[in-house]
């Protein structure tokens, strides 16, 4: 009986130990002067948004890119090659959120969630994204079902908090930073999966 228990425990260990910690893509961003963050992407909720982000990371689009906007207690925004909120990758993708007719994305905009920035047009997102800095009713009312949330910071929220606390905002109305914060590098581990983006 003792031998049977040992064998069963060994089998459980083998099956459990062989399982990957993550199946979803994991993005690692190195932020100059601040540190490293890791973001888990959620293709279950926003597959094309995730595919777009993965493709941009793999192309090196975000290397040397910046965070250009900070509204403390609200969002930190980046991903614009122009560094001023007007740029993008030269194309856009369809917005995967409920108010745009996409019903599979029920992610809420809570602390650490990453979501796509866009203009007034629902299908205008390209490369700009924002990270949510707090859990409030105002944030929920402003963003939930209106923007395509697609991932979450799973490591390094202390880095993001440090940016929120120490970066100097030049214009409190727009959130424009006095000095943009550089994303030195961004890499992604897709665990062998391929992600193909459909452009709008």
Cite the ranges covered by each PLM segment.
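Positively charged n-region of N-terminal signal peptides that target proteins for export
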Residues: 1-4
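Cyclophilin-like peptidyl-prolyl cis-trans isomerases
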Residues: 8-200
